[in-house]
Amino acid sequence: LTCLICPEKYCNKVHTCRNGEKICFKKFDQRKLLGKRYIRGCAATCPEAKPREIVECCSTDKCNH
């Protein structure tokens, strides 16, 4: 599995996940509309969203755009 790993909206930096990491995720703060920073990466399970945070998980290559 390969996931995107950069914080910008348009990301093309790809990371190969380790064994056991079968999920790509993207999370961001729903309050910040301007200058939004995304946290992307690989995970074994989908990270839990904190208050006012949006987390999206998927399981195909580069799906966390």
UniProtKB/Swiss-Prot annotation:
Pfam families: Toxin_cobra-type. It is found in: Secreted. Disulfide bonds join C3-C24, C6-C11, C17-C42, C46-C57, C58-C63. Belongs to the three-finger toxin family. Ancestral subfamily. Orphan group II sub-subfamily. It comes from the Eukaryota. It comes from Naja oxiana. Negative results: does not inhibit GABA(A) channel composed of alpha-1-beta-3-gamma-2 (GABRA1-GABRB3-GABRG2) subunits. Expressed by the venom gland. One of its GO terms (molecular function) is acetylcholine receptor inhibitor activity. Keywords: Acetylcholine receptor inhibiting toxin, Disulfide bond, Ion channel impairing toxin, Neurotoxin, Postsynaptic neurotoxin, Secreted, Toxin. Binds to muscle and neuronal nicotinic acetylcholine receptors (nAChR). It binds to extracellular domain of rat alpha-7/CHRNA7 nAChR (IC(50)=2.2 uM) and to Torpedo californica membranes (IC(50)=30 uM). Its main location: secreted. This is Oxiana weak toxin. InterPro entries: Snake_3FTx, Snake_toxin-like_sf, Snake_toxin_con_site, Toxin_cobra-type. One of its GO terms (cellular component) is extracellular region. Gene3D superfamilies: CD59.
